[in-house]
Design a protein with these regions (language model features):
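Bacterial Sec-dependent N-terminal signal peptides
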Residues: 2-5, 11-43
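First exposed extracellular module after export/assembly in secreted or surface-exposed proteins
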Residues: 28-226
Length: 226
């Protein structure tokens, strides 16, 4: 019996250790010098900096006018900055669009500014009504890119997904001057489009969803007609 208990405790200890290494937020992690340099160069006025690791990334939580989090790869390449901003800090075009939308009467919660490598800046307004919570994604010019049910997932869901050159070439040729706003890979194994890459673009002022299959070939493009 003692041997069984010891084995169980050892297994639990190993599991806890692995989890701690994957998501270390105790503020005592060692940050490589090149990463420190990259952060200081990009955010020279950052204050109250605290480092942690999430999903294999180094994440700096800091204050630079507003509370923000910056995500970097281990070799110091910046991936994303998520800034918590007040409503009045939104571009006027975003506020005008929101205030004329069906969600204008909903209660506003968090508002985030997302800056990511490879895609344009996006503003996310989280609204709620009774038991419903929805995230509204806007471009800086006030275009509503998409609205999705808030799942309270980790912020890593906003990390950019790299498009293949073939995907980029297809978008450039099929939709000239399109602005790439969001890139997601469907990760629900129960959905028919598991593993597909969804690219949200704005083409000629119209938000469109471009879908590529698991082999990277174009599958479909859809948009709303009003």
């Amino acid at each position: 019996m003692k041997l069984k208990i010891y084995t169980l405790l050892l297994a639990l200890s190993v599991t806890w250790s692995l989890q701690s290494c994957d998501n270390d937020d105790d503020g005592s992690i060692a940050v490589p010098a090149e990463l420190q340099s990259a952060f200081s160069s990009k955010f020279p006025n950052a204050a109250n900096v605290k480092w942690e690791t999430k999903s294999g990334y180094y994440v700096a939580d800091f204050y630079d006018g507003y509370e923000a989090s910056a995500w970097f790869t281990q070799d110091g390449k910046w991936q994303m900055t998520e800034t918590d901003i007040p409503y009045n800090a939104l571009p006027q075009a975003v506020k005008t669009s929101f205030e004329s939308s069906e969600y204008a009467s909903w209660k506003r919660d968090d508002i985030d500014k997302l800056e990511r490598t490879g895609v344009e800046t996006v503003f996310v307004i989280e609204v709620e009504k009774q038991n419903q919570e929805v995230d509204l994604y806007y471009s800086a010019d006030g275009t509503l890119i998409k609205s999705i049910v808030d799942t309270d997932d980790d912020n890593s869901e906003h990390l950019p997904v790299q498009l293949t050159e073939a995907m980029k070439n297809f978008i450039n040729e099929k939709y000239p001057n399109a602005r790439i706003m969001e890139v997601d890979v469907e990760d629900d194994r129960n959905d028919w489009d598991f593993g597909y890459t969804e690219v949200d673009i704005i083409h000629n002022g119209i938000p469109k969803d471009v879908l590529f299959n698991q082999t990277g070939n174009w599958y479909s493009t859809s948009w709303e007609i009003r």
